[in-house]
A protein has these predicted regions:
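Juxtamembrane intracellular "pre-TM" segments in multi-pass secondary transporters
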Residues: 1-3, 186-215
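Extracytoplasmic gate region of multi-pass secondary transporters
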Residues: 27-28, 209-262, 325, 329
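Structural signature of the two symmetry-related core transmembrane helices
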Residues: 74-88, 280-295
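Cytoplasmic helix-loop-helix junction between adjacent transmembrane helices
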Residues: 102-141
């Protein structure tokens, strides 16, 4: 297929995600020196990591409202520039309080991205490529996760942890420049465009039953993602991988699995939809695979299994964890008109990311109490099974041939 304008949009927003996630994830392999410097337990370190998400979650709904009102591209670029400020503040922090505030600012800044980039992708992408477009463009999170963990770990072996964040400050500056130059803003065009749910109000978005169900189900993959995202290097350290760079390299499999997981599940969802099979089935299938594989991760850690096996299981778990989002976001883009899509995506992400406030701390607490991360993995598996049941409650009832009714049933309320 020749290069299309929407490919440019996908590519530049992927690069934006990479910069954001490298700054977000670099703290994971650097937690050990941070814990040593400030005398933190695993639970306290987990809370420090999760401080980012308090800002991130708090900004989701305002970000959608701001983008719908003032322009998605404008809000997107403002957020990216604030990410650079947050990274700089992290690198300059000399006390634990200042470090926590810097991470909170970084979370607030990155919270402006999601609710505005998803509608831009939806507006730029052909309808028959919607799940693939949402998946491919979302792969930047995985690539940024992998690079953040690997680069953070590698730099952490040769630089003080603060200087790592100073180096990473350049990424969002480049990203903001490229997006500002080459990505157009669909906000005004969206306000005039007819479509399903054209008369939907912001209040109707907040009353939307299936958005809340999808958000509650989405808490399960977010929980698993941030168990591995926070404690991935420590999982490998528990079974004997002591070198920071090596454990970070293995933990980066969480991000490496994102492009194939998102592309595979997005392609499957688009093809099944063309045959009349709804997207929620692919969402549930991905969650089930995630639940089974993260349980196997816990068992491998508990039994002190071989490193290669844990690496494979982390990759498989991550493949299914990321795979949830391509069909889920495509379904969202079909259910809501562009005019309120920012607030819809923001509300969905706010609900899902409540799990990120708890997963790092709870998993760290389980480690402190039991001496192992295995229990935290088992808890993630249980939540994954619950998520499957919740996802299947999205209307209409699952049956062959019903998929084409999904957007009409929900979007016109």
């Amino acid at each position: 297929m020749p290069w299309q304008p929407y490919h440019t949009v996908w590519t530049l927003l992927v690069f934006g995600w990479i910069g954001n996630y490298m700054i977000r994830m670099a703290l994971s392999p650097l937690l050990d020196p941070v814990m040593t410097e400030f005398g933190l337990s695993h639970a306290q370190a987990g809370f420090l990591f999760s401080v980012f998400f308090y800002g991130y979650v708090a900004m989701q709904i305002p970000a959608g409202l701001l983008g719908d009102r003032f322009g998605r591209k404008r809000v997107l670029i403002a957020g990216i520039l604030l990410v650079a400020v947050g990274a700089l503040a992290t690198g300059l922090a000399r006390t634990l309080v200042v470090l926590g505030l810097a991470r909170l600012l970084t979370g607030l800044a990155q919270g402006l991205y999601f609710a505005n980039d998803r509608p831009i992708i939806a507006a730029a992408t052909p309808r028959d490529r919607l799940a693939v477009g949402q998946g491919v463009s979302f792969s930047g999170l995985g690539l940024g996760t992998a690079l953040g963990v690997v680069v953070g770990g590698a730099l952490g072996e040769v630089l003080p942890w603060r200087e790592v964040f100073l180096v990473l400050t350049a990424l969002p500056l480049v990203s903001a420049t490229l997006i500002g130059r080459f990505v157009s803003d669909p906000t005004r065009r969206a306000a005039r465009a007819p479509g399903p749910g054209e008369g939907m109000t912001v209040a109707a978005v907040f009353r939307h039953r299936d958005l809340w169900i999808l958000g509650l189900a989405g808490m399960a993959p977010i929980w698993t993602q941030w168990v591995i995202g926070t404690w991935g290097p420590a999982l490998f350290a528990e079974i004997g991988v002591r070198e920071l760079g090596r454990s970070a390299l293995f933990a980066s499999l969480l991000g490496i699995a994102a492009p194939p997981g998102l592309f595979a599940m997005g392609t499957l969802s688009d093809r099944l939809l063309a045959q009349g099979i709804g997207r929620k089935g692919v969402v549930a299938l991905s969650m089930l695979g995630m639940a089974l594989s993260v349980a196997a991760v816990g068992l491998t850690v508990q039994q002190r299994g071989p490193v290669w096996l844990l690496a494979v299981l982390v990759f498989v778990t991550s493949f299914f964890t990321w795979g949830v989002w391509a069909p889920a976001y495509a379904l969202m883009a079909e259910l809501f008109p562009q005019r309120v899509m920012g607030i819809a995506f923001g509300l969905l992400n706010a609900v899902c990311f409540v799990a990120s406030l708890l997963a790092p701390y709870v998993t760290g607490s389980i480690k402190d109490r039991t001496g192992s991360f295995a229990g935290g993995c088992y808890l993630a598996a249980v939540l994954g099974v619950v998520g499957v049941s919740v996802a299947m409650a999205v209307r209409p009832a699952f049956r062959l041939g019903s998929a084409r009714a999904e957007p009409e049933v929900v979007a016109t309320r």
